[in-house]
Swiss-Prot record:
Residues 1-22, 41-92 are annotated as: Disordered. It is found in: Endoplasmic reticulum membrane; Nucleus membrane. PROSITE patterns: RETICULON. The gene is rtn1. This is Reticulon-like protein 1. GO terms for biological process: cell division; endoplasmic reticulum tubular network membrane organization; endoplasmic reticulum tubular network organization. Pfam families: Reticulon. Residues 1-17, 41-66 have a biased composition (Polar residues). It is a multi-pass membrane protein. Residues 67-81 have a biased composition (Low complexity).
Length: 308
């Protein structure tokens, strides 16, 4: 251990040449230390334990603690709220902000796991009204719009029609504007003064449209899960028959034709069900009674066999 010398100028005692040299060397060491430990605005001032001591860095526990705490940041469950508050994907079980495995990445998974049907009932009623033709004009326009979206792009080259139309529009407007500038000696055009404001998209209206589409998709997704888990066995059996028919049609129909057939079935079968609802319910009730009778007879047969 080297001899320690005080740097306090107000301390009493005799001053020798060795004391002056030691004080000078200590002052130089202090200046070098302060220069090495530059203080940034975002950091705290160094404490007294950060200055040089008699022990080297490898043997000084204070310096070891400081270096370890600066090189290895401490994270706790409270310091990372994004990992706990981010939605968990029910498909992959991953956090949107931590695992980066969901399709929506930081936004989380687009699917939620819930026990309630969080869908506006008006959307379900409106969709059923369209499919059952309660409003004929709305159902007809919806069906024609879907068929037009399927067949019009195959009949008409829409990009070519778009550019062929606007090449004449842009040419005519530029000629008219140049003519107005030429007639007024470059002071005033013709068409450039007609526009009073710019037309932009309303984000709120787009959000409402997207939300309506998502609600319709959720209705179909919920109905598919009800069929899949046999909440209504008759409906599940009907869906299996429809799937068999679709499997048969997919053997010789193209994707477009198969899609059109599905759309037509979606607009025809619900209407047939509504028109024949009483007879269908009577048939279902008779089938249930027959099933109960067969179940009762089978139970009685098993009981008599066991008793013998």
């Amino acid at each position: 251990m080297s001899e320690q010398h005080s740097l306090n100028p107000f301390e009493s005692g005799s001053v020798t040449a060795s004391d002056v040299a030691a004080a000078k060397s200590g002052a130089e060491d202090l200046v070098n230390t302060l220069t090495a430990h530059t203080v940034h605005p975002s950091t705290e001032l160094p404490s007294a334990t950060s200055f040089p001591s008699a022990l080297p860095n490898s043997e000084n526990p204070v310096i070891q603690n400081i270096s370890s705490s600066s090189s290895e940041p401490h994270h706790t469950s409270q310091s990372t709220p994004g990992e706990t508050s981010s939605p968990v994907c029910p498909v992959s079980g991953a956090h949107g902000g931590a695992d980066k495995k969901c399709p929506a990445l930081e936004a989380g998974c687009p699917f939620t796991n819930t026990t309630k049907q969080n869908v506006d009932p008006e959307i379900s009623n409106a969709l059923w009204s369209v499919l059952t033709w309660k409003n004929t004009s709305c159902s007809f326009s919806t069906l024609m719009s879907i068929l037009a979206l399927v067949y019009v792009p195959s009949w008409i080259n829409l990009p070519r029609l778009f550019f062929r139309t606007f090449r004449y529009v842009f040419l005519i407007t530029s000629i008219i504007e140049f003519g107005g500038l030429f007639a007024s000696n470059g002071k005033r055009g013709v068409l450039s003064h007609f526009r009073s404001s710019y037309i932009t998209c309303d984000s709120k209206a787009l959000d409402r449209i997207v939300n309506s589409i998502v609600d319709i998709f959720n209705v179909m997704l919920i109905q598919f899960q009800r069929i899949l888990f046999a909440e209504s066995p008759i409906l599940t059996f009907t869906a299996s028959v429809a799937a068999f028919i679709e499997f048969f049609l997919s053997g010789f129909l193209s994707y477009k034709s198969l899609f059109v057939w599905n759309v037509l079935f979606a607009f025809i079968l619900p209407r047939l069900y509504v028109c024949n609802e009483r007879s269908i319910k009577h048939l279902v009730a008779s089938l249930e009674r027959s099933g109960d009778k067969l179940k009762k007879q089978a139970t009685e047969t098993i009981n008599t066999t066991v008793n013998k």
